[in-house]
Amino acid sequence: MMSASFHWKHRSNEQGKNPLDKSAMPSSTLHYMSTNNSTNNGTGTSTNTSGSSSHYTIAPRSFSEMVPSQQQQQQNKKRKRYSDDDSETHNETHSENNNDTSQEQFKPHNHRDQTASGLLHLQQQQLQQQHSLLLLQQLHYFHGSSKTKRTKIPKIIGQPLPTSRLIESLDKTHLEKLLHSLIDIHPELNKTIQKITPKPSLENLLLILQDKHAQLIDHLPYKCSETSDYSYLRIKPYLQEFLSCLEDYVLYYLPSNNYSETKHKLIQSLKFIDEATSTIHKLPNFTNSEYQYMRNLTYEQLINCWLILVNQETNCDTGNGLDYTEFHKIVEELDLLESLKQHGVQSGQEGFSKVIEAVQNKLGQNQILLSRQFGIDYGNDMTVSSSNGNRSGTGAGFGGGGGGASRSGSGSGTSSNALSDMITVDYSLYSLSNRSV
């Protein structure tokens, strides 16, 4: 094998020579040595196949070339200063744009600062995680996606209306049906309702009666005669309802056994029965025999009610019933005699003449009692004769020709005969055989 190596050797000049002399400058020599391995010839001698050394000499530079001149040094300093200024301006502009990054980049490493910043970074991460968890919990709470939060949200379930709200929503018709249904289911509620319900006023009852009469008239046919049988059949249900309502109201205003209510109710009772009789006059006069029978029977019952109200007891000694002067005031206030005359004319019923006689007799009796008690003389207006218990009056009666009214008895006139005389309808005229089709 052959190896090559390079060796630098410096030949130093002799001492004492001028160092500035170019000839005395050191020279460097490059030795190139190549060695070849010896090979055995087989004779026991080794021969150097190739072994030689080559010397290469490099020409040295002059000292002036090696040492820069003063001008070159100054120029180099200027160049260095200019380059330093440029780098500083560049660094300043770069630091203005990226101040934080440059400071962190050129900041000296400090292990304590790194530890504090790491802890701060961890705390910030923990705060962010907690904030994100809170947001998720809020979302679960509002959207109900979390099973644990569903138990905290109250479940809204529909419920029926309270009883008070149901009653508010009902109109008059449905409210009446509800009350009737309750009474049918629980009959014991009748007494409770009558106790707690306020008493109806006269104006309200008259208004209800007029409304029922208006419903009856509104259901009359347009193309047929009002007095025909077809018209009667059309309004028959409404007529029955009207008469039933009238009967209940009349019975309500009749005097009861409680004398304390008699004085208070008499004037209202007379007013109501007067208006009720006028309402009957306004009903169509159907030719149907059934209606004619019902109409005459209604007038007869009203006349009986008139007599019952007129013939109430007047007793000043016991303090029950009406005073003597109270009835006289009521008759004058209501103009009762004139109203009864009009009812007799419009209805064609002779029974109203007996009601007028009863009113006149009642006024005459009161005047006689007052004259006896206070010594008042009424002159020719009233003549009283008491022979064998007979009393006669000279007042004129309706449709009677001025004969007045007479009573016979043992002490005072009674109203039982007048009530018994009120049944004047011949019911044989309304038998099935005599009905007109």
UniProtKB/Swiss-Prot annotation:
Keyword DNA damage in annotation: no
Transmembrane segments: none
Feature: compositional bias, Gly residues: 392-412
Entry keyword set: Cytoplasm, Nucleus, Protein transport, Transport
InterPro entries documented for this protein: Cut8/Sts1_fam, Cut8/Sts1_sf
Localization (cell): Cytoplasm; Nucleus
An annotated GO BP: protein transport
UniProt feature, compositional bias: Low complexity: 34-54
Segments of this protein annotated with the region Disordered: 1-110, 385-416
Signal peptide: none
Ranges of biased composition (kind: Basic and acidic residues): 82-97
A Pfam short name: Cut8
Main subcellular location: cytoplasm
Domain of life: Eukaryota
Gene Ontology cellular-component terms listed: cytoplasm; nuclear membrane
Entry GO MF terms: proteasome binding
Family as reported in the entry's similarity comment: Belongs to the cut8/STS1 family.
Function: Involved in ubiquitin-mediated protein degradation. Regulatory factor in the ubiquitin/proteasome pathway that controls the turnover of proteasome substrates. Targets proteasomes to the nucleus and facilitates the degradation of nuclear proteins.
Assembly mode: Binds the proteasome.
Protein's UniProt name: Tethering factor for nuclear proteasome STS1
Source organism of this protein record: Lodderomyces elongisporus (strain ATCC 11503 / CBS 2605 / JCM 1781 / NBRC 1676 / NRRL YB-4239) (Yeast)
Phylogenetic placement of the source organism: Eukaryota, Fungi, Dikarya, Ascomycota, Saccharomycotina
